[in-house]
């Protein structure tokens, strides 16, 4: 019986092929918990240039490693003139159907209708009316019931982290905060194992993006980093490593990602079972 038990343990229990010692360096007296880059200004106002806004958002949200940040550049047509635009939102916190059908489609397709052609001296031409881009988009192209104009990136970040999306338009020095919140999964319930009297009563569920959205709502800052990867040979299970930039120890983060990358298992059932 013991031999059979040991055989099962070898089949289903992970044992590292080599042992190593990991030592976390202690901080000295002169070290700081948070090192903010000098170029980062929390109250920076939105630029008129879309390229500057795009680059600022990419740095602010670390889009190269943050897996749940959606940045969608596109072109919209206003009265015969094309403008570059940028949509920014968080996967798991926005309603994709609402965004596709009632935000991106009106902006990208509805206003493509050709202007009425006129003829003068035998030459056809299109009469283009000069409009205020900011007011035109706000009044005619955004059908959502809750749309706000924000002028600072701190306001943009707060809106995005709460489940709204941000819309940037080239030549316009404000951003539109649009309510497109939406969740589609099992309802979030109180935790069964970790019961607390104070603090949040929300428990994690089976869907990864719902869990990351819970963290985004509780930790309302762009400094929250969510890196996604897969674990498992037979079944690639999606996982996410979440930490606070400039606060979490970089050596510890690297060690966690190293161990996950070298985890030799077929399937991850839960956080305690492989």
Regions found by a protein language model. Give the residues of each.
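Membrane-embedded alpha-helical signal segments
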Residues: 1-274
